[in-house]
Amino acid sequence: MVKILKTGLWLRLFAAMGLIGGLSNIATAEDWAEDQWGTLSGRELDIAAGLELTWGIKIMSFGALLMILTQLTRASTRARIGASLIVIFVVSEGVTVSTLSGRGYGEDASLPVAPLLIAGLLALLALASCIVHWNDPTDA
């Protein structure tokens, strides 16, 4: 089991997903805004698209940070930083969605099931690999 839970691999995959997902969100911010907020026009659409653009930048920034820290760290340090960043990211995304949902975000929208399942699975595998390697001896 430990052989498939290689911390570096799963953290890099999760970071790459963040980079690609964030870039996708940035590129299609206006489409996301229309899908999640319903019929908007003019300034409302600009504000909603700006929110989606900012969200994409946040996701991309997380992916870049995780990728860089994965490259710069080893052993238990990598596992501990990786686990911390995954938990922080998942909690912040949950808080963001729940806060916006109370304001009408996503009420009539289609839920992107496949990307959410893939992201959830990658997050779980990356977190599990970090937990398994939490106390690995440091490299000399």
Predicted regions and their residues:
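Alpha-helical transmembrane segments of polytopic membrane proteins
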Residues: 50-59, 112-122
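Hydrophobic alpha-helical membrane segments
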Residues: 81-98, 118-125
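Membrane-helix boundary connector in multi-pass membrane proteins
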Residues: 94-114, 133-134
